[in-house]
Amino acid sequence: MVNQYQEEKSQNVYCIIDKGRIMQMESMGLSMLDYAINSTLVLSNICLHKSDKIGLFTFSDKLGATLSASNKRIQLKKILEVLYAQKTTFQDSNFELLQQHVNDKVRTRSLLLLFTNFENPFTLQRSLPYLLQLKKRNLLVVVMFKNEELEQFSTLSPNSQRQFYQGILASKMLIEKEKMTK
């Protein structure tokens, strides 16, 4: 007797993109929102090729676009059209509003890929209760972005006292972010 592995198909996958103030930060010439959009498009294409259903939510201080999960070929075009017009806002993101909206719209257990960025433990602590609520009914994956320029800055040899302290501060910020991911 031989066991054969067979992938599950038609699973619901939702990409959730934060359009708040923190996503305006740039790294290597692109904003964090641009990276989130690019990642969403790649993941959407992969999900559709694997016969999974893909959906989309965007949010900031208000709710943005909502696309219900679907595995039709036109879904990628819909996602592309919605993401083309997305811009960041100058407000902090409202994770409570997101949690309520997702609980209203997503009826079955789904994979939620949340593209956001937490630069310090205080913003994470503020959002954590709502993320835990999302996790109760779904499988939540929080995707945070690495700031390559900050990493490069922390490893530079200082030429002045000011650069020395800036390097220490950059290293401290990187350590804090690393702690948040654990």
Regions found by a protein language model. Give the residues of each.
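Conserved phosphate/pyrophosphate-binding and hydrolysis machinery centered on Walker-type P-loop NTPases
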Residues: 29, 33, 69, 92-96, ...
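DG-centered beta-turn motif at the end of beta-strands
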Residues: 17-19, 102, 109-130, 140-145
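Short, contiguous acidic/charged loop-to-helix segments that flank catalytic cores in large enzymes
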Residues: 28-32, 86-90, 113-122, 130, ...
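Structured helix-beta-strand junction loops
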Residues: 50, 86, 108-109, 137
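Short, charged loop segments at secondary-structure junctions
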Residues: 65-94
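Von Willebrand factor type A / integrin I
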Residues: 122, 126-182
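An amphipathic, basic-hydrophobic helix/alpha-beta surface used to engage anionic
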Residues: 1-74, 109-114, 129, 180
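A general structural motif
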Residues: 90-99, 172-175
